[in-house]
Regions:
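Active-site loop/oxyanion-hole signature of alpha/beta-hydrolase fold enzymes
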Residues: 51-53, 88-137
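Conserved HGGG/HGGXW glycine-rich cap/lid loop of the alpha/beta-hydrolase fold
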Residues: 46, 53-98
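Catalytic active-site module of serine/aspartate enzymes centered on a nucleophile-bearing elbow/loop
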Residues: 287-323
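Alpha/beta-hydrolase fold catalytic core
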Residues: 1-59, 81-84, 109, 113, ...
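Flexible "cap/lid" loop of the alpha/beta hydrolase fold
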Residues: 159-191
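Conserved hydrolase catalytic core segment
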Residues: 132-171
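Short beta-strand/loop motif that positions the catalytic acidic residue
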Residues: 258, 264-266
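Conserved alpha/beta-hydrolase catalytic His-Asp/Glu region
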Residues: 29, 173-174, 194-257
Length: 323
């Protein structure tokens, strides 16, 4: 009996070690293939990755879940840098930004950065970069961080939620977030996914995010999904999403306090962040908020319909007196 127990223990240790070794190897490869494209700045001991380009009024771009600044530098930012000073920021735990402090990042925990915590950290980073009265655009999860920015601070020109999370949703999230956002999944499942996730899995995931449109050619190679498959990033992402809803409930009750222009852009075929649950309610919650509805468009309008998103940015700039 003892020999059997020892044998099982040795097998478990070997398997665990193999998984961790393979995950670490893939993380090193991801870091080499997709290094920081901007600068690493320190905010109260937290490293924040920021990329600055262009000239004009300040425009901050916040990526969504599983993303990083490369989502915007694929093509979108180039369309704007001739008339805006663009500040791209990796959200906590994703890309090359650290978790927001020592209270986060535990393997066997569900500690996560709320939208308000993220907004405060990224606002401090933007301040270091000299941002003045910025427009804050947030895609998907970045949308709720942009709205938190407006609730936490009043020195911004306006908010552009793009397919942005804004209101509480019914039902449960999918298994990926419920499992990996739990303490046991964070510790046990994340390393396995990090070690063995295939390119087919990545391709299928990206395709589902863009549906019903198709991802642009070259997008996957540029954006670097391997960065998100790192154990630390997977944990940060899953926990932030899995435990997001209570924060959205709290924030949505305060939207009436937002007194800056809000111009949302949302596709009516978005099944990830549905229009009717999220952006469609904003005009009743925020005085003067507008929503541009894109018929037949899914979750990635800044790639599939960039002109509509740029027009929303320009409307905020005009309403705020920046143009």
């Amino acid at each position: 009996m003892k020999n059997a127990i020892y044998t099982v223990a040795i097998i478990v240790i070997l398997l665990t070690g193999t998984v961790q070794y393979l995950a670490a190897k893939r993380e090193r490869q991801a870091a080499a293939a997709y290094p920081p494209t901007g600068q690493l700045i320190e905010v109260d001991g937290v490293t924040v990755h920021a990329e600055v380009m262009g000239d004009g009024p300040d425009l901050i771009l916040l990526h969504g879940a599983s993303g990083n600044t490369r989502d915007f530098t694929f093509q979108f930012a180039d369309r704007l840098k001739d008339r805006y000073r663009i500040i791209l920021l990796d959200r906590p735990g994703l890309g090359w930004t650290d978790r927001a402090g020592p209270d986060y990042g535990g393997v066997w925990s569900t500690d996560h950065e709320s939208p308000r915590v993220q907004a405060r950290l990224l606002k401090a980073a933007a301040d270091q970069l000299g941002a003045e009265n910025p427009i804050v655009l947030g895609h998907s999860f970045g949308g709720i961080v942009a709205l938190a920015w407006a609730l936490e601070h009043d020195d911004l020109a306006g908010v552009v939620p793009v397919a942005g999370v804004a209101n509480p949703w019914p039902g449960e999230l999918g298994w990926y977030y419920r499992v990996n956002g739990a303490a046991w999944g964070s510790a046990l499942v994340v390393p396995v996914l990090s070690a063995f996730a295939s390119q087919d899995y990545v391709n299928a995931t990206v395709a589902s995010i863009f549906e019903p449109q198709a991802a642009p050619e070259g997008y996957i190679d540029h954006v670097g999904p391997a960065l998100t498959l790192r154990r630390g990033s997977m944990r940060a992402n899953a926990k932030q999403v899995n435990w997001l809803r209570p924060h959205v409930v709290e924030m949505s009750a305060e939207y009436g306090q937002i007194n800056v222009p809000v111009e949302a852009v949302h596709g009516d075929a978005d099944t990830i962040v549905p229009l009717d649950v999220h952006a469609a309610k904003l005009p009743d919650q925020i005085d003067g908020a507008n929503v541009t509805v894109l018929p037949g468009v899914g979750h990635m309008p800044h790639h599939t319909h960039p002109d509509d998103v740029i027009a929303a940015i320009d409307r905020v700039a005009a309403r705020a007196g920046l143009r």
